[in-house]
């Protein structure tokens, strides 16, 4: 009998908790058919479900939920969300693998509306969302375009609108992506340097290997580099300011002397003309 692994259970509980946080509060979370105990052994049955009552309009972040499931898993999977009109409510069910004969919504970037009559079912997998993005020429980078489902429940019909929502501030998102890329490149360079030190352990002397490791430890992180740059700029600006303060009396005295000299010259010239 396998022992109870609290860490694995906590990881699965954390995934479900995050999904509950991003799903609309007007959707009721129901009991699932399977528990999440091991990200390496994924269940084939339903792992979560949400239902919405009649006369209700909600937004379901389908792509974000599917990517949460994909990132949590430690084995190959293609997460799938099934949407059903039960006749009294709309039901969202999550699977790590699409069930046999699972319906797939035939949507494109131009035709993104689906109407479900009573007891009818549709669904969409993460691979299907990526295919729609490529077909519509949308940006495939993270945070650029995320699919959401606008669900309008008016029994006996449920209307679904699959829409891509972009970031609120595209320039800020671009800066975040560039910053993450630059920091990732720096960390990769440092890791490669450390790995080269480790690989050279059997080639160079222990002293040289120790010095290589010490240099890597003393190397400042990108955050420290940025802070040092800002500190140096601040010190330079303060030095310039203090220098300007020191030179101010000298400049004032020089201006007064120049004014007196000009006045004397003008006075002498005026007297010469009078006489």
UniProtKB/Swiss-Prot annotation:
Entry keywords, A to Z: Host membrane, Host nucleus, Late protein, Membrane, Phosphoprotein, Transmembrane, Transmembrane helix
Annotated stretches, region: Disordered: 197-221
Ranges facing Perinuclear space side: 1-251
Ranges per topology, Nuclear: 273-275
Annotated membrane topology: Single-pass membrane protein
PTM (free text): Phosphorylated.
Pfam families: Herpes_U34
Cellular component GO terms, alphabetical: host cell nuclear inner membrane; membrane
Chain's role: Plays an essential role in virion nuclear egress, the first step of virion release from infected cell. Within the host nucleus, NEC1 interacts with the newly formed capsid through the vertexes and directs it to the inner nuclear membrane by associating with NEC2. Induces the budding of the capsid at the inner nuclear membrane as well as its envelopment into the perinuclear space.
Record-given protein name: Nuclear egress protein 2
Organism, scientific name: Equine herpesvirus 1 (strain Ab4p)
